[in-house]
Amino acid sequence: MVNAAGRRTAPVDDVFRALSDPTRRVVVERLGRRPASVSELAEPFDMALPSFMQHLRVLEESGLVRSKKEGRVRTYRLVPGRLRAAEDWLAKQRTLWERRLDQFDEYVTKLERE
């Protein structure tokens, strides 16, 4: 995907952008259970179908979901591998911060002993 400045964004950026909206997070949770049609996905939301379709477009462009049209029904399914990219990024950040906090804890302990 390309950002507003015309630069290509990293895939993990697209995933986090897609997940930044609560409606899209609910859709991802729903698709985690099983594939669903547009009408099934849109049913719980109080919004016009074109607005809801924009959410599905963002999810599909991020690679989190894929759609398939059979006859008049478009069905969406989750692409779990894209979530793993976000999980991996978060795990790296967690490790980095845990290491920093451990170092800080050691520093505080050293100061307390002095």
Predicted regions located by residue number:
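Amphipathic alpha-helical dimerization/coiled-coil segments
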Residues: 1-11, 29, 84-114
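N-terminal helix-turn-helix DNA-binding core of bacterial DNA-binding proteins
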Residues: 2, 10-51, 73-84, 88
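Short, hydrophobic-biased segments on the C-terminal half of alpha helices
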Residues: 56-57
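Beta-hairpin "wing" of winged helix-turn-helix
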Residues: 61-77
